[in-house]
Curated annotation (Swiss-Prot):
Broad class of the protein's primary localization: membrane
Keywords: Cell inner membrane, Cell membrane, Glycosyltransferase, Membrane, Transferase, Transmembrane, Transmembrane helix
SUPFAM superfamilies: Nucleotide-diphospho-sugar transferases
GO biological process terms on file: glucan biosynthetic process
Record flagged with keyword Calcium: no
Record field: transmembrane: 140-160, 194-214, 513-533, 568-588, 615-635, 656-676, 680-700
InterPro entries: Glucans_biosynth_gluTrFase_H, Glyco_trans_2-like, Glycosyltr_2/OpgH_subfam, Nucleotide-diphossugar_trans
Presence of the UniProt keyword Cell inner membrane in the record: yes
Stored Gene3D superfamilies: Spore Coat Polysaccharide Biosynthesis Protein SpsA, Chain A
Catalytic EC class: transferase
Classification via HAMAP family: MdoH_OpgH (MF_01072)
Name of the protein described by the UniProt record: Glucans biosynthesis glucosyltransferase H
Length: 842
């Protein structure tokens, strides 16, 4: 069999069609497949003429009549997106300087948006009612939190050993030995720092406690007159004039999982009978060429399997401007005006058709709602770490989400996915300008979701959490280290967002959201400083003689005092604030039926194990978050390159590499405290033991085998595992099917395989006009690539080749026409582990 017959045999044709092709040359084969009988000046451009035929034979059920068109140079192009109808989406520059804002106000340039003019009188009254209620509730929350913090801080002050602040007079220290003055002041300086940090941290814990408590009461009562879900009956027909786009921004994601979840979601939408009201947009920012080809293949298969022609679209951006938020902005500018609403999905999102339809109904029933956020439930993971986190979010999460809604009402959070957005005000008000200045906290906004919610509210639109709406799902990171990688990005984003705290027009609730976002990570170094100062105070007490006389002619000494009964009482009170939300959560589960969680005994045991697990992980997260915050402020880049692994487990070597410093710190801390005062080590035991065990906990909890064993024992069981909804069962089934036909080494297949080459050529985005300079550049790219071995061709160069239909055509032609000349490429392709199911296109 010669190279021509080998090529013909690789074509997606029937035996009769193959036998009818000429076997004289590759050019003749492509000319025979070209129904338009195009002529090309170069022989190696002839595959451009056969692209349409190769695509039509490979994916006949995926193409509609008007998708394959000719570009300006007569090359076949696959239109994977509808015709654009552009809108203007221009960001307003940020004024983060309060002095500048004050000057604008003096000159009459500080104009507050007059949003109420678009509402009817009845809508204004309803709007004003819930906003007044929300304001009153938040003042109550502030009063409760501050009162609790003041009392606890006063108790903390009485517990601390050195009580002689009032006797210290700086004037008496003039002329005194500096060392003596320093030793007199040191304990009190340490105590002052401890007291300030305690007040801040206790206030943070108190706010979480009251949020969970109100969420518990809300869920226990079961009635919420201000719940946005109560604004519809739930079976109203959707308005055909208001169409919705389901948009999924992705970037180098697990292609099999992305398209499995998307297919399950779309089929659930079709089952409701409302598919005509929705379109799907897969918005790819992927820059891994292998993944890009796999995405194109998966999109073609998805369209064929769900009959999604004209409703499921795919786009890969050539210029990745502003990451995810820029991807969404690009969609809004090009196609947003064609839709009333859009639902943003993450790569791991799965939503039922009924949930999506309900979100649309809520938008139509609440004309002043700008964003409605569903409450995603975590499911689908098997590692011990992920199952424990799934259980925690499933049991505790509803309390905190309902509590957030209770305090915030329509001035709430948006988490960036599984939410519906009103497109027109989003385009008008939510474009994100880069933060001004230079440095680590300038440039493109990373955590865009909080900022978009704040801008939507600033324009007068409501931002709601539909906390009681079922059918919204997501997945969690499989292990601790993957979660910390995500936290590294979120930490940087939240610290950047705090620069917007004083921006004009931001609602106080969203200023508080920026503050809580910062505190989510800043609390870690504050806690670490609190522990460090407490340790330092103990060192001072153990190694130095107390200063009993702080004033000249002082008659009575100031004795250090210890009040263990108050210390125990304060410790117990703090533990109540920390752990009572967990107890309330389990009480709610007991009241509503623990069967779906494994029964009364197992859900209680799971709770106790989760508490132990969270105690072990809290100090570990504290140290990592402290490093993240410090590195962000100092402008350090935390490089985190994990080794490739076949599953989600953390290798022992990586665990000790990441946690080795924590283990060492825990050992030194424990030994030092045991030497100084064994009693103080008792109080530090939860911290130091967690640090010493951190590599072991991190590695063992990442094992799916351990997680599946707990699943068999019905520990950490959640309702989605006890009785999986159909959309999750479909996701698992489609994921299994996609894994079986998964395409690896997509770029090499796009070079060699006739079907995938046709697909890559038709979907290539660099549609340049012919030009002499461009022709020289193309020839240089192709020649340099073929004269090297494929493994020396880096990712960026592969992406350049993949983006140009002409270079892909020439690569394809040359490796087939002269296999002996380009033997390094041919041998590399033949050595690949080929998946026959992945290459089966018909």
């Amino acid at each position: 069999m010669n190279k021509i017959t080998k090529y013909i045999d690789a074509l997606p044709l029937s035996d009769a069609e193959k036998s009818a092709l000429p076997d004289t040359s590759l050019q003749a084969v492509h000319q025979a497949l070209d129904d338009d009988h195009q002529t090309f000046a170069r022989e190696d451009d002839s595959p451009l003429g056969s692209v349409k035929a190769r695509l039509a034979h490979s994916w006949p059920d995926s193409l509609s009549g008007d998708q394959l068109v000719k570009d300006d140079e007569g090359r076949t192009q696959l239109h994977a997106m509808p015709k654009a109808k552009r809108s203007s989406m221009i960001p307003d520059p940020w004024r983060t300087n309060p002095v500048g804002r004050f000057w604008d106000r003096l000159r009459g340039r500080d104009v507050t948006p007059r949003y109420l003019s678009r509402l009817t009188q009845e809508e204004r009254e309803s709007e004003q009612k819930w906003r007044t209620v929300g304001t009153i509730r938040r003042y109550i929350l502030l009063l409760l939190t501050l009162s609790q913090t003041v009392v606890a801080t006063w108790y903390m002050k009485t517990i601390l050993p050195y009580q002689g602040w009032a006797l210290i007079n700086p004037a008496d220290m003039v002329g005194q030995n500096l060392w003596i003055s320093f030793m007199q002041l040191l304990p009190y300086v340490l105590q002052s720092g401890i007291l300030i940090l305690f007040a801040v941290l206790f206030c943070w814990v108190s706010a979480g406690f009251w949020t969970a408590l109100m969420g518990f009461l809300q869920l226990l009562i079961g009635r919420d007159k201000y719940s946005i879900s109560a604004s519809t009956v739930g079976d109203e027909p959707l308005n055909p004039a208001h169409r919705t786009a389901l948009i999924m921004p992705i970037c180098n994601e697990d292609v099999d999982r992305v398209f499995a979840g998307l297919r399950a979601t779309w089929e659930s939408v079709k089952a409701t009978g409302n598919a005509a009201h929705f379109d799907v947009y897969i918005l790819s920012d992927s820059y891994n060429p292998d993944i890009c080809v796999a995405e194109q293949k998966a999109w073609m298969e998805l369209i064929a399997e769900v009959q999604g022609e004209g409703q499921i679209f795919y786009r890969r951006r050539r210029r990745r401007v502003k990451r995810k938020s820029g991807n969404i902005d690009d969609f809004c500018r090009r196609w947003g005006s064609q839709y009333s609403y859009m639902v943003v999905l993450d790569a791991d999102s799965v939503m039922t058709g009924e949930c999506l339809s309900s979100l649309v109904r809520l938008m139509e029933a609440n004309p002043n709602a700008g964003i409605i956020q569903s409450s995603p439930r975590a499911s689908g993971m098997d590692t011990l770490y992920a199952r424990c986190q799934q259980f925690a979010t499933r049991v505790y999460g509803p309390l905190f989400t309902a509590g957030l809604h209770f305090w915030q009402l329509g001035e709430s959070h948006y988490w960036g996915h599984n939410a519906i957005i009103r497109v027109k005000p989003f385009i008008e008000h939510c474009a994100l300008a880069p933060l001004p200045g230079e440095g680590n906290f300038a440039g493109s906004i990373l955590s865009h979701d909080f900022v978009e919610a704040a801008l939507m509210r600033r324009a007068g639109w409501g931002v709601w959490i539909a906390y009681d709406l079922p059918g919204s799902y997501e997945e969690l990171p499989p292990n601790l280290l993957d979660e910390l990688k995500r936290d590294r990005r979120w930490c940087q984003g939240n610290l950047m967002n705090f620069r917007l705290f004083l921006v004009r027009g931001m609602h106080p609730v969203h200023r508080a959201v920026f503050l809580t976002g910062v505190m989510s990570y800043l609390s870690a170094p504050l806690w670490f400083m609190f522990l460090a100062l407490s340790t330092a105070l103990q060192v001072v007490h153990a190694l130095t003689e107390p200063q009993y006389f702080l004033q000249p002619r002082q008659l009575f000494p100031v004795w250090p005092q210890w009040r263990p009964e108050l210390a125990i009482a304060l410790f117990a009170s703090t533990m109540v604030l920390l752990f009572l939300p967990k107890l309330l959560s389990i009480i709610l589960v007991w009241c509503k039926g623990p069967k779906e969680y494994g029964g009364f005994f197992r859900v209680t045991l799971s709770l106790l194990l989760e508490v132990l697990f969270s105690v072990l992980l809290a100090p570990v997260r504290m140290l990592f978050h402290t490093v993240f915050v410090v590195s962000a402020f100092l402008g350090w880049e935390v490089v985190w390159n994990s080794p490739q692994r076949d599953d989600d487990s953390t290798p022992w070597g990586e665990a000790f590499m990441r946690h080795g410093s924590q283990l060492l710190l825990g050992l030194v801390w424990a030994v030092g405290m045991a030497w100084l005062d064994l009693r103080f080590l008792f109080w530090l035991a939860p911290i130091v033991v967690s640090l010493i065990l951190s590599p072991f906990v991190s590695a063992i909890s990442s094992r799916a085998t351990v997680g599946l064993r707990t699943k068999r024992w019905k520990l950490f069981l959640i309702p989605e595992e006890y009785s999986p909804p159909q959309v999750l069962k479909d996701t698992d089934a489609y994921l299994t099917m996609n894994r079986q036909r998964s395409l690896d080494d997509g770029f090499m297949h796009a070079v060699f395989n006739p079907s995938f080459n046709a697909l890559a050529t038709a979907m290539a985005t660099a549609r340049h006009r012919q030009g002499h300079i461009l022709e020289i550049a193309r020839e240089r790219h192709v020649e340099q690539a073929l004269n090297e071995t494929p493994d020396k061709l880096n990712r960026d160069r592969r992406l350049v080749l993949l983006s140009d239909p002409v270079t892909m055509s020439r690569l394809h032609y040359r490796v087939w026409a002269a296999p002996e000349k380009y033997s390094s490429w041919v041998n590399a392709y033949q050595q690949l582990a080929l998946n026959p199911l992945a290459l089966k296109t018909k």
